Amino acid sequence: MRKCLKLISLAAAFTLLFAACGAADPPASGAQTPAQTGGAMQASDVQIALIAHSPESILDDQSFNQGAWDGIQRFLANNGLPLGRGGNAEFFQPHEGSDAARIDLINDAITAGANILVLPGFNFEEALYEIIEDSLFPDVKFVLLDASPRRDGNTRMADNVAAVHYAEEQSGFLAGYAAVMEGHRGLGFMGGIAVPAVVRFGHGFIQGAEHAAASLGLAAGEVTINYTYLGQFNPDPAFATQAAAWFHGGIDVIFAAAGGAGGSVFAGAETAGGLAIGVDVDQGHLSETIITSAIKALDVSVYDIINDFMNDNFRSGELRFDARNDGIGLAMASSRFQVFTQAQHDAIFDQIANGTIVVDATVSPMPSEANLNLSLVSLTEI
């Protein structure tokens, strides 16, 4: 995104629940909550819950949860509400990573007073589908990030659900383009699991590298890309070893679209003297090897939707955040580029935003030179 987004510093203890902080008792059956009455609410009436998908999914994950939480904190700060956990916002973790446990946790959050819940990631697809199917919690708003309520290939929406999608292919494109314009010729992509968002990041990365190679007049095969999925989003020393092997084999920079597993890739870069590209949020502070991060504006989208909810303008349905509304971007302010400039970034960003460049968002787990129309980049699937 072209404008620098300021992240709100987090404060307060991390142990309180809504109820422990003086939240009102749950309304009796049939009673109206602020979300039901119509008209704008007082900011203090907005009670937000961020729900984790598993016990391993922590708040300070330096990735997806953190980005959503930053948007929540921005809302609190802009409305003079206490920052951190407790008060008007809380983070909930399930005791296990099942749909039943997630639904139980959602119920717990609502019982504690939450009237708008943020659900980060594809792991909530089936749980929210079941909630809609059973007409549970119709007066509570749900913000599902990176997914839609889905089961067995069927999508089901409701008026109290916002399903937020990001143009990861555009963000990935910027990362691949910048890497090649910076002078790197050996690139790598390590995705976590081949879910649509990760696939779009990877396919965009390849297309960006191809576009840069064409812009620079490079020969066919001069830019090479190793491409793989790690099979999980959790860190593993084996991933650091694999990344180090890629670097020793001639790869200059690896784009790690892998959640927590990205930390292992960064460790491999540190060991082998390689470089990395972060994902989702600005991860530049995690390692000096990170030259930039392919961002989706989790904080912006979460803030906007909660703010609209407060103003009685909740946007239900499937929402798209892309270059046109600063929904994606590349971390430039913290970047460690030596050659690629802000002006170059802005020029290519504007071409994506105005439609001059259209990045293919087709989702097929393993890319190929044929389905991405590659003529210059040499792709190796691993």
Question: What is the predicted role of each segment?
Answer:
Residues 15-20:
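C-terminal motif of bacterial Sec signal peptides marking the signal peptidase cleavage site
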Residues 25-382:
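A residue-level marker of the well-folded mature domains of exported/periplasmic proteins
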Residues 2, 21, 35-36:
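Acidic, polar-rich N-terminal leader regions of halophilic archaeal proteins
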Residues 10-14:
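Hydrophobic helical h-region of N-terminal Sec-dependent signal peptides
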